[in-house]
Amino acid sequence: MPSKEFQTFLEKYPAYKQTESIDALRKKEYARLDDAEHIYLDYTGGGMYAESQIQKHHKLLSENTFGNPHSSNPTSLAATHLVEGTREYILKFFNADPDEYLAIFTSNASGALKLIGESYPFSNGRYLLTFDNHNSVNGIREFAHARGADVTYIPVMLPDMRVDASQLNLELARPATAGHNLFAFPAQSNFSSVKHPLEW
């Protein structure tokens, strides 16, 4: 039986009942947060691993032996099988043709973005990005500048911190014609938590 205070709370905030599934998920998959009296708010920066992920990973490691995926012995072939299976899964998830795309693994998002900056053909091109990008995305502009690309920031509008759609449409309508164009924006801003339209 809920306490009188909790019953009063539910009467005042009836929509709270709709969060029961989230509470159950937290209790099952993230009990360590409650055990340590923690609140985790950096989901756009790094997703919290679930208890089921820990258990599955533990099972995988305890039942197998994996070696260097660049060799040809049985343990290395087992690791290669996992890596290649993961590549295939990622491409399938994004409906990306494996004849046209390749999934590359890096140590972290910053490493992946640096790889883009180092390898993208910016010469005579354009790099368009929003003001609320992650700092590593902003770092790509140095590679773009060094190769002679035009770099343009799209502002966010106060108070809701959303991209100025009219300015974005203007900028998207005038691509560089002598080089490649790259537009970078976060699906969800790790500064404001705003979710941007993925259709851009």
Show the residue positions of the predicted features.
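Pyridoxal 5′-phosphate
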Residues: 1-200
